[in-house]
């Protein structure tokens, strides 16, 4: 029996090996090119994807670099605009202060002229009133023959009337 088992086992091995070689030959003859084509296509696709990813990464780096340069340029421009606005503001501030100073000086001079004019007019008015009072006082003194005390009292009463008016 052992011989039978050994021969069956040997037969099974031979049939199995024959089947494997036949299957290998058939695959090699009919499907091997397609199978290797799939692997080659897959390899090419992976290589293309890697190249595309590398190109996309390089383009992204270039884009990042460009955006950083644009941002730096925008910051520089913003700084220049702010500096120009500050300069313009200081110039306008100085101009407004100078104009206000000139206006205040002009108003002060006009006020001084108005005061001087009012002073002259008031002085002329006082002179006229003093002259009128002097004439009036002289008339009254001439109408009355008064001694020194009566003249002094008369002058004082007219001055009091002048103070009340």
UniProtKB/Swiss-Prot annotation:
GO cellular component, one term: plasma membrane
Chief localisation class: membrane
CDD domains named among the record's database cross-references: ATP-synt_Fo_b
Gene Ontology molecular-function annotations: proton-transporting ATP synthase activity, rotational mechanism; proton-transporting ATPase activity, rotational mechanism
InterPro entries recorded: ATP_synth_B-like_membr_sf, ATP_synth_b/b'su_bac/chlpt, ATP_synth_F0_bsu_bac, ATP_synthase_B_chain
Topology of the protein relative to the lipid bilayer: Single-pass membrane protein
Protein name: ATP synthase subunit b
């Amino acid at each position: 029996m052992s011989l039978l088992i050994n021969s069956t086992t040997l037969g099974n091995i031979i049939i199995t090996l024959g089947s494997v070689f036949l299957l290998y030959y058939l695959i090699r003859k009919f499907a091997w090119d397609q199978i290797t084509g799939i692997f080659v296509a897959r390899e090419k696709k992976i290589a293309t994807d890697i190249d595309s990813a590398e190109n996309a990464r390089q383009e992204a780096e270039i884009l990042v670099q460009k955006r950083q340069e644009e941002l730096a340029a925008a910051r520089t421009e913003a700084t220049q605009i702010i500096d120009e606005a500050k300069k313009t503001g200081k110039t306008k501030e100085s101009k407004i202060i100078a104009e206000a100073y000139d206006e205040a000086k002009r108003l002060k001079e006009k006020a001084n002229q108005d005061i001087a004019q009012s002073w002259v007019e008031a002085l002329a008015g006082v002179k006229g009133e003093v002259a009128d009072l002097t004439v009036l006082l002289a008339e009254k003194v001439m109408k009355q023959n008064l001694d020194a005390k009566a003249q002094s009292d008369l002058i004082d009463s007219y001055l009091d009337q002048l103070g009340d008016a």
